[in-house]
Amino acid sequence: MIQKRKRTVSFRLVLMCTLLFVSLPITKTSAVNGTLMQYFEWYTPNDGQHWKRLQNDAEHLSDIGITAVWIPPAYKGLSQSDNGYGPYDLYDLGEFQQKGTVRTKYGTKSELQDAIGSLHSRNVQVYGDVVLNHKAGADATEDVTAVEVNPANRNQETSEEYQIKAWTDFRFPGRGNTYSDFKWHWYHFDGADWDESRKISRIFKFRGEGKAWDWEVSSENGNYDYLMYADVDYDHPDVVAETKKWGIWYANELSLDGFRIDAAKHIKFSFLRDWVQAVRQATGKEMFTVAEYWQNNAGKLENYLNKTSFNQSVFDVPLHFNLQAASSQGGGYDMRRLLDGTVVSRHPEKAVTFVENHDTQPGQSLESTVQTWFKPLAYAFILTRESGYPQVFYGDMYGTKGTSPKEIPSLKDNIEPILKARKEYAYGPQHDYIDHPDVIGWTREGDSSAAKSGLAALITDGPGGSKRMYAGLKNAGETWYDITGNRSDTVKIGSDGWGEFHVNDGSVSIYVQK
């Protein structure tokens, strides 16, 4: 239950704005609204059935308007239960007996290929998760000369040089030389966090020819190249060549349509720019790519876009935090500020908007969960507006399976009507009425490419109310209803194209043609 403020509400002020039309990642000429789904959550069961779940869900996903899915890391991690963010062998997609298992947490390579085939047959694209920052689960240790650094300032060395035993020897005995004969050794990395000889955990910076932190990364903690495990050295030419080769192989082997880049702020920016370009050139495909640069600062994200020559998109982290704040202030958030400091307001064509993900869900390291009551409002905000490429979280659709008392319930019944609104009605010019601390709204006039298209949306974090909004002259005389089912009244669009639309307390309503 949200706390509501007593307020005299006046909704007559009209704020009109024209936003940049965003070409969709599906095709450059497609008239269909693109919608991405992150098809996993952190606590996806370790039952080896996830690729089968994805295949079985392909028709449903297409029907509700999902045009692309982001799959979890598909390669062998340091154990069968690893989510893929502790990558051991990027060439083992659940095909070889390694780390005590053939399958990954999610299933086998052939099952994944079958799932992708089913998705493609229904015009749903597939984006692979790319974890390039580090490697984990080495087969043996190696002697390395290293120094300790200050975790709060990785440029500050806090010890003399000494020998450590680092887990940096990757031989891949189960795969051998299949697909690649490249073996990883200490000189392919520039740091680690464990000395096996002393059984101590530190951040170790390696010594040796050319060894230093990659400098073109986030400046947090002095230099944020190091994150975890054995940190890959993208100043090493053999590493650069091998990783480009793998990216091309990965895209072709799974017929991928794009990528999600993990931990981008910890990886040399110019390398990521060149890596994306190399894969695009080799495959001849657009390979839509979105980078996870976790920073609640649009300026930092804009800097990353600049450093990578705008050849990638980024997740709109500032918008996520605005939505989280709006959900947690008991009706006290000024809804006129939802777009303040966001990527979608600065670079709408490069913003992947989202409400929740596997890192922000309850119990995770970046936990910043949007409260359940607000999620339908948040999804309406990212799914029915013209700017940004919106993403739906698996955990919001199907619920999360962790042990926190705050686990996310399935919101499928709330989200699917909003997806239907996006798929069938959210087209044409947009008019914004973001002019009140509680109740904000927007309309879409519709266009000729989608029959009966056009909509009017209202959301409020506090008291309900109404707004008079312009729906377009072409919609004059039509009767519109609330597709969410939250209100039973209908609205007749006047001869001047205007209508009076209503919303309940702490709720969302999306009106479309009957």
Swiss-Prot record:
Belongs to the glycosyl hydrolase 13 family. It catalyses: Endohydrolysis of (1->4)-alpha-D-glucosidic linkages in polysaccharides containing three or more (1->4)-alpha-linked D-glucose units. The active site is at D262 (nucleophile), E292 (proton donor). GO terms for molecular function: alpha-amylase activity; calcium ion binding. Ca(2+) 2 binds at D190, A212, D214, D233, D235. Residues 1-31 form the signal peptide. GO terms for cellular component: extracellular region. The record marks D359 as: Transition state stabilizer. GO terms for biological process: carbohydrate metabolic process. Its main location: secreted. It holds the Pfam family Alpha-amy_C_pro. This is Alpha-amylase. Ca(2+) 1 binds at N133, D225, D231, H266. It comes from Bacillus amyloliquefaciens. Ca(2+) 3 binds at G331, D438, D461. Na(+) binds at D190, D214, D225, D231. Monomer. Keywords: Calcium, Carbohydrate metabolism, Glycosidase, Hydrolase, Metal-binding, Secreted, Signal. Disulfide bonds: none annotated. Binds 3 Ca(2+) ions per subunit. Binds 1 sodium ion per subunit. It is found in: Secreted.
